[in-house]
Every structure is written in structure tokens, then in C-alpha cells.
Amino acid sequence: MRRLAVYLAIAVGLFAQAPKEGARESLAEKADEAGNKAHAAEEEGSMDIWKWANFLILAGGLGYLVGKNAGPFFAARSAGIRKDMENSLAQQKDAEARAADVDRRLANMEADIAALRGEGERAARAEAERMEQHTAAEIAKIQQHSEQEIASAGKAARMDLKRYAAELAVELAEQKVRARMTPETQDALVQGFVRNLK
């Protein structure tokens, strides 16, 4: 607490003296300013001459550099512009030629479409004719194969019929032989067979 009171007392003392010192400084400054203004006015007159001299030297140097480099710069610039214009004209002619080619193609497009349609119809007819010929050939092959199968089936049926007829004939002959065969005839046959084996 004591410290705070001491600090406040010092601060009040300093502020009380500050206006007095500020007043002294402002009087001294005003006197210096008046002297400086007079001296500055004398120096300013001589400085204006040097400023103009520096300006004239700078303007002359810039004028010399511009005069020396401006001619070639503008010549190169105009040559570049001329070249760009020539390129533009060439591109314009190329674009016009392409546009004329497109117009010509568009004009011929109807004829091209009609030609393509005619060619497509001819190709379709040729394909249909080829398909008809192929179908006729396939039908002929199928008929020939069917005829061969029918002939083969007929031959097999005839063979089966002959075999069946032979089997029937054998059965009939067997029945006839059995009907004629008596036990005495059978014994005589067996004994004759046994004798032949010896």
C-alpha cells in the first residue's frame, strides 16, 4: 500500500513539472523555426536551379534513348502486325475453302444417300437370292437323305420279314416233325446217333 502511495506521488510530481518544460521547449523551437525558414528560403532558390538542370539532363537522356530505340521497335512492331495480317488472310482463305467444300458435300448428300439406298437394296436382293439358293440346296440334301433313310428302312423291313418268314418256316417244320415223331422213332434216332459216335 505504501508503495502505491509513493508511485502516485512521483507521478503527480512529474506531471506538474511537464507543462513548464514543454513551454520552454516550444519557445526555443519557435525561434529555431524562424531562423530555419529564412535559411531554407535562400537554399530553395539555388535548389530550384539544380532541380531544373537534373530534369533537363534526365529528359535529354530519355529522349536520346527513345529516339535511338523507337525506330527499330516500331519497325519490328509494324512487321509483326503485317505478318499477323497475312496469316489472318491465309487462315480466312483456308476457312472459306473448307466452308465451300462442306457446302459442296451437303449439296451432293441427297445423291449420295439415294446411291447408298440403291446399293443397299441391291445387296438385300442379292442376299435374299443367296438365301433362297442355300435353302433350296438344304431342302434337296434333306430330301436325298430322307429317301436314303426310307430305302434303308425298307431294306431292313424286308430283311426282318424274310427272317421272320424263315423262323416261321422252321417252327412249322419243327411242329410237323414233332407231330410225326413217336417215342419209338425217337429212340431209334438216338440209338443210331450213338452208334455213329462210336
From Swiss-Prot:
Subcellular location: Cell inner membrane
Top-level taxon of origin: Bacteria
GO molecular-function terms, A-Z: proton-transporting ATP synthase activity, rotational mechanism; proton-transporting ATPase activity, rotational mechanism
Transport as UniProt keyword: yes
Keywords carried by this UniProt record: ATP synthesis, Cell inner membrane, Cell membrane, CF(0), Hydrogen ion transport, Ion transport, Membrane, Transmembrane, Transmembrane helix, Transport
Keyword Glycosyltransferase: no
GO CC annotation terms, alphabetical: plasma membrane; proton-transporting ATP synthase complex
Residue stretches spanning the membrane: 49-67
Membrane topology of the entry: Single-pass membrane protein
Pfam families in UniProt: ATP-synt_B
Main subcellular location of this protein, as a coarse class: membrane
Function: F(1)F(0) ATP synthase produces ATP from ADP in the presence of a proton or sodium gradient. F-type ATPases consist of two structural domains, F(1) containing the extramembraneous catalytic core and F(0) containing the membrane proton channel, linked together by a central stalk and a peripheral stalk. During catalysis, ATP synthesis in the catalytic domain of F(1) is coupled via a rotary mechanism of the central stalk subunits to proton translocation. Component of the F(0) channel, it forms part of the peripheral stalk, linking F(1) to F(0).
HAMAP family, A to Z: ATP_synth_b_bprime (MF_01398)
Family assignment from sequence similarity: Belongs to the ATPase B chain family.
Quaternary organization: F-type ATPases have 2 components, F(1) - the catalytic core - and F(0) - the membrane proton channel. F(1) has five subunits: alpha(3), beta(3), gamma(1), delta(1), epsilon(1). F(0) has three main subunits: a(1), b(2) and c(10-14). The alpha and beta chains form an alternating ring which encloses part of the gamma chain. F(1) is attached to F(0) by a central stalk formed by the gamma and epsilon chains, while a peripheral stalk is formed by the delta and b chains.
PANTHER family documented for this protein: ATP SYNTHASE SUBUNIT B (PTHR33445:SF1), ATP SYNTHASE SUBUNIT B', CHLOROPLASTIC (PTHR33445)
Protein name as catalogued: ATP synthase subunit b
